[in-house]
Amino acid sequence: MQSIHALLLTAAVCILFQGCGGSEPEHRLYAALFKNYNQFVRPVKNASDPVIIQFEVSMSQLVKVDEVNQIMETNLWLKHIWNDYKLRWNPVDYGGAEFIRVPSGQIWKPDIVLYNNAVGDFQVDDKTKALLKYTGDVTWIPPAIFKSSCKIDVTYFPFDYQNCTMKFGSWSYDKAKIDLVLIGSTMNLKDYWESGEWAIIKAPGYKHDIKYNCCEEIYTDITYSLYIRRLPLFYTINMIIPCLLISFLTVLVFYLPSDCGEKVTLCISVLLSLTVFLLVITETIPSTSLVIPLIGEYLLFTMIFVTLSIVITVFVLNVHYRTPKTHTMPVWVRTIFLNLLPRIMFMTRPTSDEENNQKPKPFYTSEFSNLNCFNSSEIKCCKDGFVCQDMACSCCQYQRMKFSDFSGNLTRSSSSESVDPLFSFSVLSPEMRDAIESVKYIAENMKMQNEAKEIQDDWKYVAMVIDRIFLWVFILVCILGTAGLFLQPLMTGDDM
């Protein structure tokens, strides 16, 4: 047992010394480089020479865009390359080692910060290591999560484009001490992780030399302009399409007949559904008072649309149920709504001639137009004084017999001249005259009822014409309003 322990201990010691022997050149190199190294002094031989910093930003992820607080959160990799003459060596003296990785906190680094940082540290963390090359070139690529200030314009939300800038530069050194050189002309997007809400259109970079009011020196900065476009699919499905459907239901209110009694009910139901929908999506819309978002304008447009439909529906129902006892139809209403507008909108109304042609001809002539079935128990068998086709109807048989006998009496008592109506009426019996007078009274009442019904039908037709007018008006307003609102961002996007 003791021999086994001795064997294991010997193997561990051998492995340890072997590892130390393999890293011994790197250990000597590290000790030689930082023996007299001062990390607070710029790595230049001449104090008047600037340190050339090659700088590039790589976008890893666009985390979030906060429209309310005007903040863009990004995950970036900042690439710094410069030359430090104090960190040079001959690879031959150190086992051929050409590269060495050292903690970035032990070497001099440029203090590159994000000028328009909104939250958190302005400078990146130095916990990552830097790569040193035997020629003195230092490559340092620290990752960082920045929350930069960005002026968000939500006018065309959810079809909006944003331009967010990120300004990097040295906070302490002017151009005479540190000169920045941009690597490439755009932000590096090779390792970019696609966002589910935003798409990056382009991200050009620019170098600026600016003289600030506080100082006489010129400071160099590198600014990236990030042009991003919101992906509107989520908002289209969950916000815009429901609003379009609600607007379509509002249009159908004017196609619903007034007699069904459900026009106002449908209007109120549509308004309630829109109100509930607005409460649900309130948190989705950017809550800002600077501008009204496009989707907010459309929701407001739909709300006014539905409210106006309720007002018009109440007016149409008021017109629909008017009677001669309560309202007199003006001449201009009859001219415009019964004659002019129906022809313009291709509305056809059955005329009185067509209705009369569909009725059967009466059995009585002009001289006996007031004859009718005067038996109250049998008057239910016939309609409007016309002979029915049922030969067993006693009422119609009686009318035929009376008409035949009366015609015979008139023929026998008449001469070659035409029959005098007064004589014709005088030969009737008193009972017959009373019956005829009663029938006259009934006929006059029926005529008055028919005239009143015609006026009521005219009011109903006026209400139908008004409904048809607003049906087309609301269809046009819905189409033009929707197209006008949502074509604006498309035309703006083409200019970018």
UniProtKB/Swiss-Prot annotation:
One of its GO terms (molecular function) is acetylcholine receptor activity. Residues 258-259, 318-465 are cytoplasmic. GO terms for biological process: acetylcholine receptor signaling pathway; behavioral response to nicotine; membrane depolarization; monoatomic ion transmembrane transport; nervous system development; neuromuscular synaptic transmission; response to nicotine; synaptic transmission involved in micturition. It is found in: Synaptic cell membrane; Cell membrane; Endoplasmic reticulum; Golgi apparatus. Residues 23-241, 277-298, 485-496 are extracellular. GO terms for cellular component: acetylcholine-gated channel complex; cation channel complex; ciliary basal body; cytosol; endoplasmic reticulum; Golgi apparatus; neuron projection; neurotransmitter receptor complex. Residues 1-22 form the signal peptide. Pfam families: Neur_chan_LBD (PF02931), Neur_chan_memb (PF02932). Na(+) binds at residue 262. Activated by a myriad of ligands such as acetylcholine, cytisine, nicotine, choline and epibatidine. The heteropentamer CHRNA3:CHRNB2 activity is blocked by alpha-conotoxins ImI, ImII, PnIA, GID and MII. The heteropentamer CHRNA3:CHRNB4 activity is blocked by the alpha-conotoxin ImI and AuIB. Glycans are attached at residues 46, 163. It is a multi-pass membrane protein. Component of neuronal acetylcholine receptors (nAChRs) that function as pentameric, ligand-gated cation channels with high calcium permeability among other activities. nAChRs are excitatory neurotrasnmitter receptors formed by a collection of nAChR subunits known to mediate synaptic transmission in the nervous system and the neuromuscular junction. Each nAchR subunit confers differential attributes to channel properties, including activation, deactivation and desensitization kinetics, pH sensitivity, cation permeability, and binding to allosteric modulators. PANTHER family: NEUROTRANSMITTER GATED ION CHANNEL. Neuronal AChR is composed of two different types of subunits: alpha and beta. CHRNA3/Alpha-3 subunit can be combined to CHRNB2/beta-2 or CHRNB4/beta-4 to give rise to functional receptors. This is Neuronal acetylcholine receptor subunit alpha-3. It comes from Gallus gallus (Chicken). The lineage of its organism: Eukaryota, Metazoa, Chordata, Craniata, Vertebrata. The gene is CHRNA3.
